[in-house]
């Protein structure tokens, strides 16, 4: 039996967008549309779609490599019961996803974006990213805030509480500037933020002196 492009597209949508397992998808298509499609055929539909979109995915990778700013992350999940990692590299307009059994450099090298990326990469301080020397690094402030709050709650570090307020205040200033149609903060505000930030870092070092 032959199936048309609409059936195949709907099947791929159910699997990739709604995350419906093959057996449930098979049952859904049979119950709603009286289509007796095997799970093997459903997998074939997906593999064909993956092959068809390769030119588009390669174009996305190439565009991200040339971007001035990129974002990278890795999220653990399971493939057929085995631990794997979903790697993402994105810009404000494009996102590339690829699963890999490794979380580290073996995966990011195989994916091929970061070895050629020369812009600024925003990430979560995962050690793998620092192994790439052609790019600039920017660390995620959400992760900074989590670590700072942990220092406040677990170790009663006063400097960490001040840094939380500093980062959140800077974020609020950026949001207000954005709402006002500005693309950057005034130089005076930036200078003040830097001064407060540096003072808090100095306070933190005073609270936690380096060993002799």
What function would you assign to each model-found segment?
Residues 1-212:
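Catalytic center-proximal scaffold of phosphoryl-transfer enzymes
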């Amino acid at each position: 039996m032959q199936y048309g492009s609409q059936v195949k597209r709907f099947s791929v949508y159910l699997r990739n967008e709604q995350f419906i397992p093959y057996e449930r998808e098979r049952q859904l298509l049979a119950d709603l549309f009286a289509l007796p499609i095997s799970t093997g055929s459903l997998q074939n539909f997906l593999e064909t779609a993956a092959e068809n979109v390769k030119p588009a995915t390669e174009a996305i990778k190439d565009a991200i490599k040339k971007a001035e700013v990129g974002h990278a992350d890795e999220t653990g999940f399971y493939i057929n019961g085995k631990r794997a990692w979903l790697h993402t590299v994105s810009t404000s307009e494009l996102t590339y996803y690829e699963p890999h059994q490794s979380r580290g450099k073996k995966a990011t090298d195989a994916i091929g974006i970061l070895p050629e990326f020369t812009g600024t990469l925003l990430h979560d301080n995962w050690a793998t990213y620092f192994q790439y020397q052609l790019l600039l690094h920017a660390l995620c402030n959400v992760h900074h805030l989590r670590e700072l709050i942990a220092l406040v709650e677990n170790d009663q570090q006063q400097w960490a509480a001040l840094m939380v307020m500093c980062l959140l205040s800077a974020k609020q200033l950026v949001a207000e500037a954005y709402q006002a149609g500005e693309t950057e903060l005034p130089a005076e505000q930036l200078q003040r933020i830097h001064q407060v930030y540096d003072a808090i870092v100095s306070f933190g070092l005073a609270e936690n002196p380096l060993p002799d």
